[in-house]
Amino acid sequence: MALTAALKAQIAAWYKALQDQIPDFIPRAPQRQMIADVARTLAGEEGRHLAIEAPTGVGKTLSYLIPGIAIAREEQKTLVVSTANVALQDQIFSKDLPLLRKIIPDLRFTAAFGRGRYVCPRNLAALASSEPTQQDLLAFLDDELTPNNQEEQKRCARLKGDLDGYKWDGLRDHTDIAIDDDLWRRLSTDKASCLNRNCHYYRECPFFVARREIQEAEVVVANHALVMAAMESEAVLPEPKHLLLVLDEGHHLPDVARDALEMSAEITASWYRLQLDLFSKLVATCMEQFRPKTTPPLANPERLNAHCEEVYELIASLNAILNLYMPAAQEAEHRFAMGELPDEVMEICQRLAKLTETLRGLAESFLNDLSEKTGSHDIVRLHRVILQMNRALGMFEAQSKLWRLASMAQSSGAPVSKWATREIREGQLHVWFHCVGIRVSDQLERLLWRSVPHIIVTSATLRSLNSFSRLQEMSGLKEKAGDRFVALDSPFNHVEQGKLVIPQMRYEPTIDNEEQHIAEMAAYFREQLESKKHHGMLVLFASGRAMQRFLEHVADVRLLLLVQGDQPRYRLVELHRKRVESGERSVLVGLQSFAEGLDLKGELLTQVHIHKIAFPPIDSPVVITEGEWLKSLNRYPFEVQSLPSASFNLIQQVGRLIRSHACRGEVVIYDKRLLTKNYGQRLLNALPVFPIEQPAVPDVIVKPKAKPARRRRR
């Protein structure tokens, strides 16, 4: 389709009307460029797909929504906007699209949040009820569906009143009533516990109401995981050929796609025996009380017992083999080099893949049959069995996926990382098996790049080391296929608005020097805190261990610090805002996740402290396997893997500071390797251009601490 004069005029008119809606709107050349690039790509005028880096301040959301809606209407397609986190998804759904509705009055949009973000009306009714009979009936389905106290019951009753009165849409983030994590866990549900069409509340269930709205919407706001699942099953969303797709926060896409090639599950022999026995009893119950129309052959008790016995014997053999690779009776880990399993283990995994897939099929068959019996059996007993069968299906789905991955030699031309771990819980040994695919470009090509005609991949950060190479390698997007890669200029004047501070640290932030380095960092941070120049501060760490050591050094000012994990992130940010706006000092402290999606403008954040260059963990089995594979191809892992990842993380961290034209402040990076190592200049060159200062650090005396024992992690 060509961009007609009428379509261009419509996009321009909406953009002009938008300027009238936003107070103090500042026209930006990068925004106009993005609107044009997005329009040309979605209309099929230029290239296959577009990867466009739009720095903070460009206004990327509205830059893809305006042309996207115009072209979707012209082509009678659905515009799907996908994000990586709930905060951005909710911002688009609750703020950006309602703003556009003012200039596009008949705009129809909806959101497809994950099931866990919605209240389950069945659970809510149980927890809101003050009548013992109602509580007893529903508590029979789940022991946790009774309120802990009268105050909790009243809170749930208010929530139910809002839901029934259409004052609340059932989303956790859309109510002012406080819901702690424990209560929400009981109010919501997951796929395994959802009764779906068999539920009395199905028609008014907020989750299913939202899913039905998708069919009528012009714009659907989804998340990457849902989009990937929908492309795999051709469910929830319209057919790929009838979509226009925007992947916001597109740098997360390879990680989300990797979920399809990632599985960890317990394989302890005694645990497995218990699960198989419970499933056999469940099948017997179904055959006795809810006999299916057609009996699956495997439901025969003798056949099922023989099948489960073979599964158990294989699992027991695998446990015995894996134990030979790990020290006896203690926590341990064994990784298989290049993901290559011994022949004996590979044969076991291949057989388990077939056997557990058969059990998965049996569970699914019974579940489908049970779902058709709601009108002819005791509803409470039937629903109880449906829930149990749902959970069995989930377990066998996970096991089938695990052994299928374990049986794969490669994915997207790269090995599948495989390792086993042994843990001790309450004095008992538990064995786990793990599989993670290193590359997912083939999956993305099959599900997205080849299926959807035109896709926009965007984010404030898509490049690392000023290059799209890492994105191309991980995603499979490539110029040869007609994909375009565009990096927009920042609308901000970083030279005038901020500065980069690299203190003259005596120690590098290595494991050997960690204690001394953190002591120096704490001393400089304390000096900055005592100067009272900054009311809003952010401190970012590369590891939880380092963050805890830092907190020990500044324990006397702990009340000023809002630390990740103390409360949910959104509450920490709310409290930070309130403190700063009331003239108090406030310091947010967190890990890499706080370097993304945190939008604090002006006085809310004027100083960012970065512990060190965040290289990926060298003890991760996935990173080690990837390194082995790269070396086998005569590629240098540090250049391909570590440095691009560190650059990407650093760009995101530094990007927390300048969020608007009114922002002023400084970024403090406690890592002298930026100035002393050859790669340091390359990392600096990928950052916005700030003036650099190198102040002295207060003297500190620290006794070296014994090296902590490190456990490997993925």
Swiss-Prot record:
Pfam families: DEAD, DEAD_2, Helicase_C_2. [4Fe-4S] cluster binds at C120, C194, C199, C205. Residues 517-698 form the Helicase C-terminal domain. It comes from the Bacteria. A motif (DEAH box) lies at residues 248-251. It catalyses: Couples ATP hydrolysis with the unwinding of duplex DNA at the replication fork by translocating in the 5'-3' direction. This creates two antiparallel DNA single strands (ssDNA). The leading ssDNA polymer is the template for DNA polymerase III holoenzyme which synthesizes a continuous strand; ATP + H2O = ADP + phosphate + H(+). Keywords: 4Fe-4S, ATP-binding, DNA-binding, Helicase, Hydrolase, Iron, Iron-sulfur, Isomerase, Metal-binding, Nucleotide-binding. One of its GO terms (biological process) is DNA repair. Its EC number is 5.6.2.3. Binds 1 [4Fe-4S] cluster. Its cofactor is [4Fe-4S] cluster. InterPro entries: ATP-dep_Helicase_C (IPR006555), DEAD/DEAH_box_helicase_dom (IPR011545), DinG/Rad3-like (IPR045028), DinG_proteobact (IPR039000), Helic_SF1/SF2_ATP-bd_DinG/Rad3 (IPR014013), Helicase-like_DEXD_c2 (IPR006554), Helicase_ATP-bd (IPR014001), P-loop_NTPase (IPR027417). ATP binds at A54, P55, T56, G57, V58, G59, K60, T61. One of its GO terms (molecular function) is DNA binding. Residues 17-294 form the Helicase ATP-binding domain. It is an enzyme of class 5 (isomerase). PANTHER family: ATP-DEPENDENT DNA HELICASE DING, DNA REPAIR DEAD HELICASE RAD3/XP-D SUBFAMILY MEMBER. Belongs to the helicase family. DinG subfamily. Type 1 sub-subfamily. DNA-dependent ATPase and 5'-3' DNA helicase. Unwinds D-loops, R-loops, forked DNA and G-quadruplex DNA. This is ATP-dependent DNA helicase DinG. It comes from Salmonella typhimurium (strain LT2 / SGSC1412 / ATCC 700720). The gene is dinG.
